[in-house]
A protein has these predicted regions:
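Phosphate-binding loop of NTP-binding sites
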Residues: 2-75, 79-256, 260, 264-272, ...
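Buried hydrophobic packing segments
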Residues: 158, 162, 181-185, 324-334, ...
């Protein structure tokens, strides 16, 4: 009798608990892939799948136990119990059920499919509620911001500037999907808000159009079109098409501001029904001039055909100035005075983990550009790093989601690091071969090139080699699905 009780307890603990533990790691990855099975399957490989068994591994972003995740866990538990019971009945061997842990990936995918009708119904209800809220605010000005990169920073800059005149709301964090925007509207948008700034992210054709159908923006900003998320977009043409879904959605009396510094945008001469303003660091409808840097930040002038404005900001880097230029264009369109714009720009702060400079009590300067990375942004970060006279150290895992150009771009990145830094610490083996090859071709000595398994190991190395007066650039941090 006691033996049977022990066996049953073991079956519950190991036969259900162990598969569920592995399922939680898989649910974590599914959540980072927007609960889309197609993206989840693309992530799956033997190498990646085996990594889900490392449940003690520290995560960059922990699993968020949303109501959806809790429903998914409940369905997984039910599936595990049913399958385990079937295995025991068929084999008459309770230990065979432990093999179910090897199929956690399939259990999570099946649970996601089974829950899909319920989730779709719930999401539609939330969507309809958000739509109703927007329709009840006909005087609300909605500004949409999208781009391969730069959209989050631009959103923050624009929010700070427009707040000098309007009661403004922006989508928080990286809430840039349809469901993220829906949640923002339902939880944060109030009748007293005058401007709503919506960040729009995309990983495949149609994503921007979907958000536009919800919010119907009257003003849009496209910060960049470049090779990003290529595993899902497959081509630069698809990236361009998707970003310009915003242009297609704007009304005839609307305004579109686009960054002409990117060739894909500059070469797109299609006419849209809305008014279009091209901005650039050099020559365009609106451009920059008289840029000067100092220890306190940057002075620059934004120039248009019939107006110009001199500004000062604590931000550094030309790409940040481009994002500010787009914000100034929208501020002008919405009637802010030059004085309001100047005050707003002077109050803009760097967004956390996006080229923010921090001076540590130890005397070390940290350039934190760890949110994500791309060829354009990485070059700008290295340009900033090269301006520091002290020993310069780069800590990076390289760039991801660049499709078949990933090796080539990371090799170029390595060569750029060699020209801008004294020491390189390459984190993770995802891009290690490409970056180290570029570092060597760029002329960096092997003794200055180090490879760390993870950020924790990189930190240990830094503690040994860094000293007061040094400058450390953290360029990118890989999502958990790549670790």
């Amino acid at each position: 009798m006691l033996c049977n009780i022990i066996n049953i307890a073991a079956l519950v603990v190991f036969g259900v608990g162990l598969p569920l533990l592995i399922c939680l790691n898989n649910i974590h990855i599914l959540q980072q892939n927007s609960y889309r099975n197609s993206r989840y399957r693309r992530w799956f490989s033997l190498k990646n799948y085996l990594s889900t068994f490392k449940w003690t591994r520290k995560q960059k972003l922990p699993l968020v136990y949303t109501p959806r995740v809790k429903r998914l866990i409940a369905t997984c538990v039910i599936l595990i119990i049913i399958i385990q019971a079937g295995i025991v009945l068929l084999t008459q061997n309770m230990y065979c059920g432990y093999l179910l842990t090897a199929f956690a990936f399939l259990i999570v995918q099946a649970a996601n499919i089974l829950n899909a009708p319920i989730e779709k119904s719930i999401a539609q209800g939330y969507y309809n509620d958000a739509k109703r809220i927007l329709e009840s605010m006909p005087n609300l000005t909605i500004v949409a911001v999208t781009g391969s990169y730069g959209k989050t920073s631009t959103k923050h800059y624009l929010h700070k500037i427009l707040s000098e005149k309007f009661i403004t709301l922006m989508t928080p964090g990286s809430f840039n999907t349809t469901l993220g925007v829906v949640r923002t509207i339902r939880e944060h948008l109030k009748p007293y808000h005058q401007v709503f700034i919506v960040e729009m992210g995309a990983k495949q054709v149609g994503d921007i159009e979907e958000i536009c159908k919800l919010v119907n923006p009257s003003i849009g900003i496209i910060t960049a079109v470049a090779e990003q998320h290529m595993e899902t977009f497959h081509s630069l043409e698809n990236v361009l098409k998707t970003k310009f879904e915003l242009a297609e959605s704007l009304p005839a009396d609307g305004l579109l501001a686009i960054n002409n510094d990117f060739p894909a945008i500059a070469e797109n001469h299609r006419q849209y029904k809305c008014r279009t303003i091209r901005y650039s660091q050099t020559q365009a409808d609106v451009h920059l001039r008289n840029i000067s840097y100092s220890s306190s930040g940057t002075k620059f002038e934004v120039v248009a055909k019939d107006w110009s404005i001199e500004l000062q900001t604590s931000l550094v880097g030309k790409y940040n100035l481009s994002n500010l230029t787009a914000s100034v264009i929208v501020a002008k369109e919405l009637g802010l005075t030059d004085q309001q714009i100047k005050i707003g720009v002077s109050r803009v702060e760097q967004v956390e983990h996006r080229l923010s400079i921090k001076r540590q009590p130890s005397g070390i300067t940290v350039i934190d550009d760890a949110f994500n990375s791309n060829p354009y942004g990485a070059q700008m970060a290295l340009d900033v790093l090269s301006g520091f006279p002290s020993k310069r150290i780069v800590v990076t895992p390289g760039m991801i989601e660049l499709g078949d150009k990933q090796f080539e771009e990371n090799k170029k990145f390595g060569a750029q690091i060699a020209r801008s830094a004294d020491i390189a610490i390459v984190v993770n083996k995802v891009n290690a071969d490409a970056i180290t090859e570029g570092l060597r071709e760029g002329g960096m000595d092997n003794s200055k090139i180090m490879v760390a398994k993870n950020l924790f190991e990189a930190t240990t190395i830094l503690n040994k080699i860094s000293a007061a007066g040094d400058t450390i650039l953290y360029e990118n941090d890989l999502p958990d699905m790549f670790k």
